[in-house]
Design a protein with these regions (language model features):
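Short loop segments at secondary-structure junctions
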Residues: 11, 191-192
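Conserved beta-strand segments that form the floor/walls of ligand-binding pockets within enzyme
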Residues: 6, 22-26, 41, 82, ...
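Short, glycine- and charge-enriched coil/turn segments that flank and shape catalytic ligand pockets
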Residues: 12-22, 50-52, 113-118
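S-adenosylmethionine
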Residues: 49, 83-191
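Generic structural signal for well-ordered alpha-helical scaffold segments
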Residues: 12, 43-47, 141
Length: 192
């Protein structure tokens, strides 16, 4: 995935390059193994945007793969948020096995959330359906600091214009976009 990120099943043996950042994952029931185009594009964007010491929020965290990748890339702390209890359990378990339970928090719910202070995150990722992204655009932008990055994915190319309009109306600026098959991912910056 990307330049240095490698996602492997936790039970698999893997020998890679010294520069590889290996993320071992047992996906369980929750979505997010790194192989679906939307997850793959999110991971590529995370590799491009996460800097050492940043604070990361994953809305719709599923298996926790995006948080694990962000932490492996140097994020200081990651918060996962999901409406599905199975995803919360899976994400917590994967973060613990990956050795990141001390640097992560997983909460049930969506944004806005009492445990998610406005402007507290440098990078926010949301790999969720277009209609949900449109509804949450303002809350996602509120969660990120001024000049911070929001990565959206889970959007079919036919809905990309609607998602971009919602984020631009809420104060987001498109920084980059990519597409695999019919799926898109877009990186927005919160206007200063």
């Amino acid at each position: 995935v990307g330049t240095n990120l490698v996602i492997v099943p936790r039970s698999a043996e893997f020998t890679g390059r010294d520069s590889d950042i290996v993320v071992g994952l047992e996906p369980g029931l929750a979505f997010g193994t790194g192989h679906h185009p939307t997850t793959l594009m999110c991971l590529e964007e995370i590799e491009d945007t996460v800097k050492s010491g940043c604070r990361f929020l994953d809305v719709g965290c599923g298996s926790g793969v995006l948080s694990i990748a962000a932490l492996a890339l140097g994020a200081e702390h990651a918060v996962g948020l999901d409406i599905d209890n199975d995803a919360v359990v899976s994400s917590k378990a994967n973060l613990e096995v990956a050795g990141f339970s001390e640097r992560s928090t997983v909460l049930q719910g969506s944004v806005p959330h009492k445990g998610i202070p406005d402007g507290d995150f440098d990078v926010v990722a949301a790999n969720i359906a277009a209609n949900v992204l449109i509804k949450l655009a303002g809350a996602l932008l509120a969660a990120v600091s001024e000049g911070g990055v929001i990565i959206t994915s889970g959007v079919l190319d036919t809905r990309l214009g609607d998602v971009v309009s919602a984020f631009e109306s809420a104060g987001g600026v498109v920084q980059a976009s990519r597409q695999i098959e019919d799926w898109t991912a877009t990186r927005f910056v919160r206007a200063k």
